[in-house]
Amino acid sequence: MCVICFVKALVHVFKIYLTANYSYNFRSWPVDFRWDDLHVPGTNNSSHRALTCAAAAAGVWLLHDAALGEDALTRPPRGARSQVQCLLQQIRELPSQLASYALAHSLGRWLVYPGSMFLMTRALLPLLQQGQERLVDRYRGRRAKLVACDGNEIDTMFMDRRQHPGSHGRGLCLVICCEGNAGFYEMGCLSAPLEAGYSVLGWNHPGFGGSTGAPFPQHDANAMDVVVKYALHRLHFSPANVVVYGWSIGGFTATWATMTYPELGALVLDATFDDLVPLALKVMPQSWKGLVVRTVREHFNLNVAEQLCCYPGPVLLLRRTQDDVVSTSGHVPSLPSCQVEGDVEGNRGNELLLRLLEHRYPSVMAREGRTVVIRWLRASNLAQETALYARYHVDDEWCLATLRSYREGRQKDLDHTKTWGPHGPSFPWFVGQGLSARRRRHLALFLARRHLKNLEATHCSPLEPEDFQLPWRL
């Protein structure tokens, strides 16, 4: 055997050995990065508070308390309450609390996160192994074990394109992919940005694939926290070059990341909902309504819309017009002036867009603005969307000029204040005050079209690489 043939054979055997290593127990791997493994000077800056704080995911519980009407910052101390009333209240609520806990830790967890079921993981194991081999062989993926602040081990895969960024420089941008409730990075949503030429970091929810733990919201947030830290401090991407992409239930961790790290570059949400409660009520018996609402609020409070409104950066929503998973019938009010094909009225992405625009541009979305956006949301295909947009004769150039003029005015006013955020003047913007109803409708339609893109696809259809786009920037 010649020397060249021997080297080729050795490389082939080494590849087989590396691939085989992916199939053994991930717990045997050494830890590559911990949530507190930070050696960056100046991290006491408030904008990086989550990078050095053990309670990085405390924001989940703050929103949890707010959802239950118990804002920890405003409620009186317990010492001021009647001890007897508190005791009686706790006794009355004990049966429902026990029922909620039992439901959440049995049937509820399997319904919300079916990918954490052992039988599903075993059934998908051959496909997961093939997916790992593909990412390693074709894209030179690097698998790593991260440890979150709760001790869970998080399985990740990183594909680095910085050495060959492409003609558009996409490889210099990192896309962190947050999978759905039955998705794994080995065969999940990361394929679209990966094939589009971006650097990609995929990770599995706690309890999915090689990740340990259970996929409850707090654990998911802790996992997302260490993934973001890994991207910034070990992979050395600047925050402005990091895009968070969440598909389906991955929108919760995606919005949590951008809420906690507002300096991150952009957010893309694909087939995502605003709140889990309406979707849970759709599939559960009506007689269980009280128990379902309590269980979701206490154990699965995936309040995506609330977290989305806390992020000041560029956002793009991808709505799938044939999506029946994140849809509840008849939620958006019916408007007789627009006929649609298909059922897009109940898509929870509609509510997500409305909440976002109402938070960022309250004057534009008042009355006429909200009505015309609801009408636009009922368009189920590109032809209807374009026809409605043309009917109102929206002047894109005027809308852009108006928004830029308002931003420049805010910039001058905020030059000597601390309200300047990482993406410019903080929201809400009160642009549109004093404009006619017609002009407000134009701005509302313009903003809606820039923040939401329709895709003629079902919930689980793989996203095409050309459909993965970065959000619009003013």
UniProtKB/Swiss-Prot annotation:
It comes from Rattus norvegicus (Rat). Residues 175-293 form the AB hydrolase-1 domain. The keyword Lipid metabolism applies. It catalyses: a 1,2-diacyl-sn-glycero-3-phospho-L-serine + H2O = a 2-acyl-sn-glycero-3-phospho-L-serine + a fatty acid + H(+); a 1-acylglycerol + H2O = glycerol + a fatty acid + H(+); 1-(9Z-octadecenoyl)-glycerol + H2O = glycerol + (9Z)-octadecenoate + H(+). The keyword Zinc does not apply. InterPro entries: AB_hydrolase_1, AB_hydrolase_fold. GO terms for molecular function: monoacylglycerol lipase activity; phospholipase activity. The active site is at 248 (charge relay system), 323 (charge relay system), 423 (charge relay system). Belongs to the AB hydrolase superfamily. ABHD16 family. Its EC number is 3.1.1.111. Gene3D superfamilies: alpha/beta hydrolase (3.40.50.1820). Keywords: Hydrolase, Lipid metabolism, Phospholipid metabolism. GO terms for biological process: monoacylglycerol catabolic process; phosphatidylserine catabolic process. PANTHER family: ALPHA/BETA HYDROLASE DOMAIN-CONTAINING PROTEIN, PROTEIN ABHD16B. Hydrolyzes the sn-1 position of glycerophospholipids with high specificity towards phosphatidylserine (PS), PS-PLA1 enzyme. Also hydrolyzes the acyl chain of glycerolipids with a preference for the monoacylglycerol (MAG) 1-acylglycerol, MAG lipase. Plays a regulatory role in cellular lipid homeostasis by modulating genes involved in neutral lipid degradation and in phospholipid synthesis and composition. It is an enzyme of class 3 (hydrolase). GO terms for cellular component: nucleoplasm. This is ABHD16B.
